[in-house]
Amino acid sequence: MGPGVTEADVVIVGSALAGLVAGAILTRHGKRVVVLEQTDTVGGRGGAVRRPDGYWIDFGHRDGHDVGDCQLAWHYGADAAREAGVEIALHRIDRPLRLHRFPEGAVLDGTWGPEGFLAAARDFFECPEDGFAELARVVGEFARAGPDEQEAALPETLGTWLPRHVSHPGVRRALLLMATVIFHRHPEEASVGRLMQFFQNPKGDGPFIPDDGEVGGMQGLMEPWARAIRSRGGEIALGWMPVEIVVDGGRVHGAVAVDTTNLVHEVRAPVAICTYPVWEVFDLVDERRFPREFVTAAHELRGHRADLIGWQAGLRRLPTIRATGRTEEHAGWNRLLRGAERAYRGGYQITSLSSRRSAPPGKHLLMLVMARWFRGGSTAGQPWTVARAELDEAIDYLRRFYADLDACIEWSAYQYVAAPQSTSWAWAPIARHQLEVPGIDGLLLAGSTLEARAAVVDVGAYAGLSAARRALAIL
């Protein structure tokens, strides 16, 4: 696509999962679709990027938008794939969770969800024997809470809720550990309502890691939709940076994008689907066009961003577990907790045990990552020297856990993914936005900041499916 004008039914801003899902569904219905993507690959921050040596590095393109993860639940995604006529190759993780406490070296296996967590309550969350009944009661109440209870509990954090509702200090600690293991560096700040939703959101028969036959890692979740869009006559304009969603007279008229020389291509369309986090929409549509309370909520949600630091290692072969003498075969997630306080230190996985294209033939890829919440600041507030020291401490633990890690490493490098990355706001004690905004007809906000009873990553599929259905109704 060069400078000029294109007429379309729908313009999609960003090729994150939601945009690709929506585009595949809409083109199947014969709609004219143009996807504007400023980078040179699809997937935004949710896919993977290939190194020249054939390794696929998750968490997307440096200049992409939206967020991602390295595993996924897949409920709404399965519905979307059926509606789009797209096949997604997924590898189910049979042993989804392994917990490491370091430096002492305790290693425990477990599963996600209320039943799995209660089964491991004593070992995983160190719940005292005389507190187990109370823990079971609280988790059961969370898992059964109705929509009204969830909504009422949404603005309350565990830090304020636990002292009033849980009598046993060991149970309070166990519930905070539970939130840490699920995914929160600061569990006392997690929303009680969101924890209820975690136990109830449909997740499909997962977790999964994509296992595409052509591309590796999370890019395997992105490319099948893109192939469908292109094969049905849709256009994915790579290298074109959206600079404006055109709104005039209270309705959408399309979008404007520029190439690297700032020359313009205008896509004229009555519907625009934006896949960016909600506060980034204001770079494309003046925030004064939105209701004041909408803008306030969007900026508040922005304060719950996180970035991601990590370490990636290409392996010549799989390492050997020191304690057993066996070659590593755990394909699930490894959560790392440090010290007696069980502080969050991220986790790791060997992606190549599930994704056949994530590493060159015969080789493997290990990724270790830690999310850092901004907590209302403009950055995580942690200098790189401290962050690197935390990573090095975790890497040193891996050298103790594995007998021969250094001998397996072909290359390694630190990773630093600027915010926003990871669905850190999934735990925020505030309501998120809806698909449509009063007063702007034809604008559909389908990023991962959408309010939805959906798991991380799967929320993108939900957003894309919802946006496609609404666009079809508008058209």
Question: Which sequence ranges carry the predicted segments?
Answer:
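N-terminal glycine-rich phosphate/pyrophosphate-binding loop and immediately adjacent elements
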Residues: 2-127
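Helical element adjacent to the flavin cofactor pocket in flavoenzyme catalytic cores
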Residues: 200-264
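A conserved FAD-binding loop/helix module that cradles the flavin
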Residues: 61, 450-472
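C-terminal segments that line or cap access tunnels to active or ligand-binding sites in enzymes
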Residues: 311-417
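A glycine-rich dinucleotide-binding beta-alpha-beta segment and adjacent secondary-structure elements
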Residues: 178-182, 395-453
